[in-house]
Amino acid sequence: MPLIDIYRRAAILFVFVLALVFTGCEKHSPASSDKSGAAGTTTTQFDINSIADTYDSVAPFADYLRWGPYNVHDPSIKKFGDYYYCYSTDVGYGITVRPGIQIRRSKDLVQWEFVGWVFSSLPAAGAAYIQQKGGAPNNALWAPYVMKTGSEYRLYYALSSPTPRLSVIGLATAASPDGPWAERGLVVTSTNDNTTQTNAIDPTVVTTPAGDQYLYYGSAWDGIYILRLDPSTGLAAVAGDKGKRIANRGFTNGVYNGNIEGAEIIYQPAFGKYYLFIAYDWLQTKYNTRVCRADQPTGPFLDFNGVDADSNIDHIPMIIAPYQFMGHGGWQGISHCTVFLDDSGHYYYASQARPSVNSNFMDLHVRKLFWMTDGWPVVSPERYAWEGNNLVTQDSLAGSWERIALNYTVVPGYAAEQVNPDLQVSQPVTLAANGTVSGAVQGTWTYSAPWLQVVRAGGGTEKLFVQQGRDWENKKPTIIFTGLDNTGTAVWGKKQ
């Protein structure tokens, strides 16, 4: 099958997965709230155990004010004032929901309240462009990106269509994160023709220390693109410019090893580098996140092995992927992330996750993100739950653990081919007080808080960040670790 036909199948299938979204919408008043916490602190009058993996009881549209962390896909989160605001794709479990970009907010990253929608209908400029090109716009907006420039709030959105690659990325602005939002214009478009270009969806933006701005976008057809913006308007610096490709992935027998999309870009001042997070594979099953980094926003972005992200290979590290701890069905479809800061400078990683018992549910997962000493990001194996940042003592580490090495199997293709989520399953290991490791891994361990070093018998080393955490599978406090081994494979663990 020609490669472009594979891409078209991917686009059509993606539309089908999100086809639960339909017409009309309006701004609603925020849900009442008596929350008073902040990230890193506990709150009152809320039972964290009430957060379920599936949510049939609140799925009906009439209960949208109770959705909280449910029905979330492709979130973009930023802290504005007292609240973290989350803007996300128009989706709903088993129902028809209104389009317009869903808005939620939280004071503590655990309790979320549904606020409303950005738009009361499909943005006129984007819908008109698609209609002018002979298409019919989807009744859904996808993958927003939110930011603040000066006193202006900017929200980039994607509007696509059943016509392959006929899509737009538009910009709306507001004086408040609650809106009202007004269209400013189209930033970049893509069409169903014979040109070489990626699909104009999945925007993300970085502002350099000098004030320059760049938009990164794309899905399938031709990888991830970068486009220079005019910081004064948020639109393309050169009208009609599509930008250039900056990241790609591998092929097998002329077929992509899976989708590449859902980029997130940040600048990390402590390391002076730009980090590009990219979603690989099918969104309902094998979805996982890769990271590359660069000294300049225009690249080249390099992977763990120093290979240019624009090379036709699959890049590492893969910092999160479908996984399963003991006593739980597992989580899959866990990528297209947002990376953001709290007021104390701590980083967080958030995305949707789908419970493997029924992957049609879509839950918001927020996790702490940590930095290795050599500048690579790693994420917690468990969701954030108000845990503090106190150092864990060496005596606390001895005992029984579950360990997951995030390995990967290539399955070229999209939804039809990538049916198996390839859950990475935990294995038991024991850290003995005498410094030995036994179980699924044999070797020795040493600890200098917060770093746990494991030397594997037969070769290989692991450097792991140790942190307090919550065992969500067993609903109790625990200790977690996350890090990379010497080959760039992510390694997770939690104490039993």
Residue spans for each PLM region:
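N-terminal amphipathic alpha-helix initiation
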Residues: L13-F14, P69
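C-terminal motif of bacterial Sec signal peptides marking the signal peptidase cleavage site
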Residues: V21-G24
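N-terminal leader/targeting signatures
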Residues: A10-I12, L18, T42
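Alpha-helical transmembrane segments and their juxtamembrane interfaces
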Residues: L18-A19, P300
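Short, intrinsically disordered, low-complexity terminal segments
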Residues: Y7-R8, F16, S36
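Bacterial N-terminal signal peptides that target proteins for export
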Residues: P2-I12
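Carbohydrate-active catalytic/glycan-binding domains of CAZyme proteins
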Residues: K27-Q496
